[in-house]
Amino acid sequence: MATVVIVGSQWGDEGKGKMTDYLSQEANVVVRSQGGDNAGHTIEFDRQKFALRLIPSGIFGENTTAVIGNGVVINPQALLEEIKYLTDRGVDISGLKISSRAQVIMPYHLLLDECQEKAKGAAKIGTTKKGIGPTYVDKVSRIGIRVADLLEKDTFAAKLKQNLEIKNQLFTKIYGVDPVDFDEIFNQYYEYGQQIKQYVTDTSLLVNDAIDRGDKVLFEGAQGTMLDIDEGTYPYVTSSNPTAGGAPTGAGVGPNKIETVVGIAKAYTTRVGEGPFPTELNDEIGDYIRETGHEYGTVTGRPRRVGWFDAVAMRHARRVNGMTYLSLNLLDVLTGLKTIKIARAYELDGQEINYYPASLAELDRCTPLYEEVPGWEEDITQVTDYEDLPANAKHFLDRIVELSETPLATISVGPSREQTIILRDPWRG
């Protein structure tokens, strides 16, 4: 068997789509295992750029099966819009498969997300208001509606009625907004179910059979380690597990089926929304990196917060993911900087620490301890061999490897598939 999990090792937006695009050239199956349409990824294919939110990047591979697994929460309206977006641009989506066990984002989840965020005021966490959190809450509360339920008219009606009895009480008595209408939701979402029915199957069976046959299976992550509900900067996190452990549970396979974990990172750090960010840059250098790296959200368009590479957070990601390799993106963005900094440790209350604190209060008191390395002026966007990189760029990469305690698999020097330096092939170890 050959299985590779791709995880974001920072706060998301690390460029996982490019690595997925590269590895999916050989993959037989590409699986999305968690999250929803709150996370966007951009893929270059056939000289076109595609911004996807739900459908796995493997949809562009010839004879590749693209799976939306049971751990994903699906907004069927967003999914159908994405299907149309792809088919209108000539993409064959016959390889798309959707888990019958995946949870469905309903209109009341979207409204509840908005009401809850507004009620928090200054304590808001910066949700994308896509209904992700409320959908996962219903899943854990065992009242969620799954894709399989959409296809059974009586089951869907009963579950929807039960949910609206609870949700409309919240809307009218707690949040002071109008209730949502049963008939409108039922008719619309039952029709959505009929439209996606042709793609729905037992994806756990499909993926396990593929692995047992010796097919190459790629697990495509969304968000990033530092947004993980357990291992991230809680409560400023997503509602699922973007770490490597979330891949087998969200795809319906055993953990012993996972062979290789590739962590994706930028040569610097970004995050969107609220929450701690020890290496954040609020100066001209931060502005330079943001503009040069086009650091604006794929889904929201929001400017991303920018900071130096954080080796403390990276070691945390290496440990909790069991990372085999690190894939470093956007090295070219740092070109032109005279000096580049890497956070090698933190100082907390006068003591040097090498771990990432769970306490937000402690994180607020942490000061990064930086190692400075010289930058480079040479254009590296056409470099395809590691040895052809400038000496200072290679020194920077050496320090990233040493401080992150993880070997490099690839280095990205531009957005296209060709602008990738391959050091190790994750499929072959």
UniProtKB/Swiss-Prot annotation:
EC number of this enzyme: 6.3.4.4
Key words of the record: Cytoplasm, GTP-binding, Ligase, Magnesium, Metal-binding, Nucleotide-binding, Purine biosynthesis
EC top class, as a word: ligase
Annotated InterPro entries: Adenylosuccin_syn_GTP-bd, Adenylosuccin_syn_Lys_AS, Adenylosuccinate_synth_dom1, Adenylosuccinate_synth_dom2, Adenylosuccinate_synth_dom3, Adenylosuccinate_synthetase, P-loop_NTPase
Gene3D superfamilies: Adenylosuccinate Synthetase, subunit A, domain 1 (3.40.440.10), Adenylosuccinate Synthetase, subunit A, domain 2 (1.10.300.10), Adenylosuccinate Synthetase, subunit A, domain 3 (3.90.170.10)
Cellular component aspect of the GO annotation: cytoplasm
Annotated GTP binding sites: 12-18, 40-42, 304, 330-332, 412-414
Gene Ontology terms, MF aspect: adenylosuccinate synthase activity; GTP binding; magnesium ion binding
Catalysis performed (reactions): IMP + L-aspartate + GTP = N(6)-(1,2-dicarboxyethyl)-AMP + GDP + phosphate + 2 H(+)
Function: Plays an important role in the de novo pathway of purine nucleotide biosynthesis. Catalyzes the first committed step in the biosynthesis of AMP from IMP.
Similarity field: Belongs to the adenylosuccinate synthetase family.
Protein name as it appears in the record: Adenylosuccinate synthetase
Origin organism lineage: Bacteria, Bacillati, Bacillota, Bacilli, Lactobacillales
Gene that encodes it: purA
